[in-house]
Amino acid sequence: MVAWNVGVNAADAPTVDALATPFPLGCFTEKLKLSGAYRSVKKHLYVHGTVLPRESPFRVFYERAQAAGWSAHALACGHDVMLDEPEKTAEVLESLI
């Protein structure tokens, strides 16, 4: 069971565990090559699930998004915000339209 490790609600854990795949560690060790096309993106959004079993490693990304002027939202739920808070997640996404 991996779901408990990222703060998934107990009711959602079987679904998350069934859908989870091994995480590619290369994302931490390999350099990312960007084309520059990201500069043309006009709207930026970061959604942070704040309820985790320990200090969130994602909080720094939430804070960076806020500092950069992104639309940054903190939801009181686990890592899989779309499972824990589907209606709030939809509201946040629709706010960009």
Q: Where do the model's predicted regions map?
A:
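Alpha/beta-hydrolase
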Residues: 1-60, 70
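Residues in flexible loops and secondary-structure boundaries
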Residues: 24, 36, 80-83, 91
